[in-house]
């Protein structure tokens, strides 16, 4: 069977959560073509090498601004957003007609589908949530997603169905328009395993996200490293580079492969990172405490950070007000997410069952 798999390029998180699914598809013996761009595609290439075919097709800019959010800006960008989705779909249509795929899986790319071929969307943001919770805006965005996603056989949400245990909150729960038969809650996707080892790293700092905010966070954090006491490891989220340096006693990597990141996260007492959804799944599976720094302008991360701070799981601070020495003390007081007996392998198995029938 030939499978087309689209990966979103809005940071590395989508590529990271897709990795265990791609590995399962490959193990099944299917031929996989990965569509992506930039660092996300670079990451997949480094992890899977010649096991896949790769095709670079750019996706579209996210429908939010880089610095601040306003409903007017969001709505104003929608016509551009729709044109970009249509342009993406036109390229995908040519690719499908040239290669004859039997299944299509897309992570958060609305234009990667083909009529008549079973197409599935991995997506955890079925409604957009603006700061201040403008309810009519939220209903409109859910309605837009509902109509836009009708091209897919099912929406695969990488979250737990139980509202008291879920990670995404109102992003993908308490829905008004989506029918239960259309949405499949897979569980948590994470290729990292919890390991029994001493926590001999005090702080692991993961700097990530779309540019220019990734670089801005790097420039904000690195000068503050001397103010932290203990052993520090930093990952810069740049898979196109392979560098390792020491800076004010901290070990800094341009990029960590998944095996190394698994070990370092297991050894760390506190994780400092963006509240990207993939990161939250990793924190939950590993049972780690964290300091969360939302990417400015990304309403999803702002909501998730606020949601989990309100639930008493993690401490969060804005990028602008970040004071590492002060904020790590606050973050230590929060216990992290507890999802006992949740196995990522179950989510992978459910994905294979839904998409391939077993």
Positions of PLM-derived features:
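A nucleotide-sugar donor-handling region in carbohydrate enzymes
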Residues: 130-212, 236-239
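Donor-nucleotide binding loops and adjacent catalytic segments primarily
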Residues: 22, 184-270
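Conserved nucleotide-sugar donor-binding subdomain of glycosyltransferases
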Residues: 69-111
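Leloir-type glycosyltransferase catalytic cores
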Residues: 77-80, 313-358
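A short, glycine/small-residue-rich beta-strand->loop->alpha-helix junction that serves as a flexible
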Residues: 7-19, 212-215
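A donor-sugar binding/catalytic signature common to diverse glycosyltransferases
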Residues: 261-303
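Conserved nucleotide-sugar phosphate-binding/catalytic loop shared by glycosyltransferases and other
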Residues: 2-9, 27-79, 251
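Active-site proximal beta-strand in glycosyltransferases
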Residues: 115-131
């Amino acid at each position: 069977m030939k499978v087309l798999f689209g990966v979103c390029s809005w940071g590395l998180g989508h590529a990271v959560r897709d990795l265990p699914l791609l590995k399962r598809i490959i193990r099944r013996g299917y031929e996989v073509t990965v569509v992506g761009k930039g660092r996300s595609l670079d990451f997949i290439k480094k992890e899977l090498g010649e096991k896949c075919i790769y095709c670079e097709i750019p996706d579209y800019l996210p429908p939010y601004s880089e610095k601040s959010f306003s409903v007017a800006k969001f709505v104003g960008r929608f016509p551009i957003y729709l044109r970009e989705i249509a342009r993406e779909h036109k390229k995908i249509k040519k690719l499908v007609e040239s290669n004859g795929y039997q299944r299509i899986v897309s992570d958060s790319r609305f234009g990667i589908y083909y009529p008549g071929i079973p197409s599935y969307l991995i997506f955890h943001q079925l409604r957009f949530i603006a700061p201040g919770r403008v309810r009519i805006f939220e209903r409109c965005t859910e309605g837009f997603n509902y109509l836009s996603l009708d091209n897919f056989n099912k929406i695969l949400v990488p979250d737990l169905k139980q509202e008291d245990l879920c990670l995404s909150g109102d992003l993908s729960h308490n829905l008004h328009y989506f029918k239960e038969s259309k949405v499949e809650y897979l569980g948590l996707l994470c290729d990292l395993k919890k390991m029994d080892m001493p926590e001999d790293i005090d702080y692991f700092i993961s700097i990530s996200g779309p540019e220019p905010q990734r670089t801005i966070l790097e420039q904000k954090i690195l000068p503050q490293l001397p103010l932290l006491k203990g052993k520090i490891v930093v990952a810069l989220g740049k898979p196109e580079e392979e560098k390792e340096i020491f800076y004010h006693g901290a070990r800094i990597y341009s990029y960590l492969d998944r095996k190394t990141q698994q070990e370092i996260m297991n050894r760390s007492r506190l994780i400092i990172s963006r509240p990207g959804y993939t990161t939250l799944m990793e924190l939950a599976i590993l049972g780690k405490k964290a300091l969360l720094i939302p990417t400015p302008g990304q309403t999803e991360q702002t909501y998730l950070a606020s949601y989990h701070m309100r639930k008493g799981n993690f401490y969060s601070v804005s990028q602008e007000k970040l004071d590492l020495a002060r904020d790590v003390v606050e973050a230590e007081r929060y216990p992290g997410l507890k999802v006992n007996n949740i196995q990522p392998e179950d989510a992978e198995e459910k994905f294979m069952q839904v998409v391939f029938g077993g």
